[in-house]
Amino acid sequence: MKYYETSFEEYLQSKNSFDIHPEIKIQTNKLPENINQLNNLIVYGPSGSGKYSVALDIINKYSHNELKYDKHTTVYTDKGNFNLKISDIHYEVDISLLGCNSKQLWHEIFFKIVDIISIQKDKEGIILCKNFQNIHSELLDIFYSYIQQYNHSQANIKIVFIIITEQISFIPFQIIQTSQVINIKKPSQKICNTYLEISNNSSNTKKTQEDFSKYI
C-alpha cells in the first residue's frame, strides 16, 4: 500500500467530497462516541481499496481538532531512528518499515507512544498499524501482549489499536477476537470513473487514475 505525503485533512476532504464506500460509513457511524468504549479495529481489504481513508475517518471521530494538525516525532533506538506521523489522538506505525529488528524496534516505539499519552490530559490514544500483513513472525507472536496491556478498564491510560492489512487469515485468533473487523472491497472502475468525472468538472486541474489512488 502506498501512503502519500498528504495531510490528514486533505485525505478527509477528498473522502468527504466523494465517498467510495458509503456502506462502510453506515457501519462506522455506529461506533461509540467515547473512545473509552471503542474496541480495537481491523480494517482489511486489497491494495488500493481505501482502507487508510476509512481508518482516518474513524480516527477523526475521536480527534479534538478534526485531524487538522499533523506532526512528526522521532523514536531514537540502538537499531536506528524511526519517524512517526502523529495527530492529537493517533500515532501511525508502518509495520513494513520495522525490518529484521522489528521486535526490539516495536518495543521502543510502543513505549515512546505510551510516554506521550501518559502526559496528556485525557490519557488516551490510537495506534494505527499500517501494512500489518508485512509483520515479522517474531513480533506477531507477541503482538497481542501489547494490545491488551492498555485496553482494559483498570489501565491508567487507554490505547486502541487500528490494524490496516491486506489479509486477515494470518492474524492470531486472540487479536481477531478482541477486535471489530471491517472488510473493505476494492472500488470498481465505474466508481473510479465517476470520481474522476466529478473532480474534473469541479476543478481546473485534470485528475488522473493516480490521483484517485492517492486519496483512497
Where do the PLM segments sit?
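P-loop/Walker A NTP-binding region and its immediately flanking N-terminal helices
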Residues: 1-132, 140-142, 152-163, 173-175, ...
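Conserved Walker B
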Residues: 131-135, 168
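Short, conserved "post-DEAD/DEAH" coupling segment immediately C-terminal to helicase motif II
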Residues: 144-146
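Alpha-helix N-cap/helix-start and coil->helix boundary motif
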Residues: 168-169, 189
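C-terminal helical "lid" of AAA+/P-loop NTPase domains
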Residues: 213-215
